[in-house]
Amino acid sequence: MPTKTSAGRGAKAAPSAGATLRPAPLSRPAPADLVAEALALDRRLAAIDSLEDRLVEITRSVPGRVTFSTSLGIEDQAVLNAIAASGAQIDVFTLDTGRHFPETLDTLEASENRYGLNIRVMFPDAREVEELVARDGIYGFRLAVENRKACCDIRKVRPLKRALQGAAGWVTGLRREQSAGRAHMPFASWDAADGLVKLNPIADWSLEQLEAYVAANNVPVNPLHARGFPSIGCQPCTRAIKPGEDIRAGRWWWENEDGKECGLHNRPRQKEAAA
């Protein structure tokens, strides 16, 4: 089984003929051919049933480094299991905001032990966190949406951008069922914000399908999921949901329900090239 580290990868399997995606420089808009190639990969992934086979197709189609960001929630644990099972050459990293539940950190350790992986841990800049807390207070993110978004930006978005530097593909564990904003999410799209291909190999999975996969493969799962936490983020910003509530109702519960995102997955993505 290959060891996932923060170091660059060796040579990848040869891509399918005519199916290679070519990353564009980060400072330029996505040319029309890159958008078209991402759409073609999206169609190929939709025709594949197995998660493991989808991951292999991703590594065949996307040249250069492919990386997977895990929040250590149940969706990401399923993808992590499939990466290990398939031997797909995909780096793995997670964001430690400094405010995780202890159970989340326990899941990180259990996952590394189970799969023999070295999961790269990305931290926010300490000085930026100090300045944020000095300005807004330790719980200032509850006073205004702008404060909360600033906190997410420093603790999550900026470390994410550092982790994605130099990557050609970014794998996530997002599912369409998770929120209205993700209902039409593709398997693959050109990510204009980061200059790479964004890949969602379990986009079409139902919760029942996800839970069945996890049970069948004895995947390590964050115990908070069994305590009413379908979506798990930072401890001060996450609560258990009540019966009948949306699965993301426990995230930033003091805010309006519309468009509650941390900024990791709601930036501009696939765009048409300028005429």
Each PLM stretch: what is its role?
Residues 2-275:
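Nucleotide-activated chemistry modules centered on ATP-dependent adenylation/adenylyltransferase
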